[in-house]
Regions:
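Exposed boundary/loop context
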Residues: 29, 139, 232, 251-252
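C-terminal GPI-anchoring signal of eukaryotic secretory precursors
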Residues: 222-241
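A cross-kingdom C-terminal cell-surface attachment/processing module
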Residues: 239-251
Length: 252
């Protein structure tokens, strides 16, 4: 998850340079923005962005879209690139143009949208492992991977709603005695508007064997992203990050 944060750091660096007026030479800020794109994508994806060997966030998006039926340009398939990668790719290009144009405020709004979407595969991972732990006899491996996803998203959920974060933590923490996947899913979905994401973007946990959603893991139907709330959540997230992560470590 350190790469995830470094991607954001590079974009923030680009915006800092933009605000300082370094955009006058069109190099520093644009270069930092491009570095953010590189750390998001990696070198293995190639020109078409379709591979099973990727290692960074781009590949995580593609992997989770197959689990949640959000692949393809329309976001309704289990094959190909994640729709989120199409969407974020467009935002990368837009942000680059805005910085080159010196429109720092608009670039900030674009980064807010990118950051919100980057959290989606982490939320998908949290919900899928909650289901596997309760309904598919998941063991230590699933518990550890689920706890890892939770460690990455819990501060952001907490910034939106501490009660929702507590619900997720109680079910997914290392050493949890029981997991309630429906409670986890409901708690996460309740903060979608504050996180700036939608039900359609997240999808539902797909059972490829039956070509249906796992029971209780269907996509939700009502959520409207709010960019203002997303900005507030982003600011608050970093303030609680280390406290909540320490709680996860101490419970091990």
């Amino acid at each position: 998850m350190n790469v995830f944060m470094y991607v954001i750091r590079e974009f923030e660096d680009a915006l800092d340079d933009c605000q300082k007026g370094i955009i006058s030479d069109n190099y520093n800020s644009v270069h930092a923005w491009d570095e953010g794109v590189c750390f998001y994508t990696g070198s293995i994806e190639g020109q078409d962005g379709v591979t099973s060997d990727g290692k960074l966030i781009h590949q995580l998006m593609d992997k989770r879209c197959a689990d949640f039926k959000t692949c393809g340009s329309e976001g309704d398939s289990v094959d190909g690139r994640a729709k989120l990668n199409y969407d974020i790719g467009g935002l990368f290009t837009l942000g680059n143009f805005q910085i080159k144009s010196g429109d720092c405020s608009a670039a900030r709004d674009t980064l807010e949208k990118i950051t919100a979407k980057m959290y989606i595969p982490l939320l998908q991972g949290t919900m899928s492992y909650a289901y596997e732990l309760e309904m598919l006899q998941g063991g230590e491996k699933e518990g550890a991977e689920g706890a890892t996803f939770v460690a990455a998203v819990l501060p952001r959920i907490h910034a939106a709603d501490p009660v929702a974060a507590s619900t997720v933590y109680d079910s997914m923490k290392v050493g949890a005695t029981a997991t309630d996947y429906k409670a986890v899913k409901s708690a996460i979905e309740s903060v979608y508007p504050s996180l700036g994401i939608t039900c359609e973007e997240v999808g539902g946990f797909w059972n490829s064997g039956t070509n249906t959603y796992y029971e209780g893991m269907e996509p939700c139907t009502k959520s409207e992203s709010t960019s203002t709330s997303s900005s507030t959540v982003r600011s608050a997230t970093f303030g609680v990050l280390f406290v909540l992560f320490a709680m996860m470590v101490l419970s091990m």
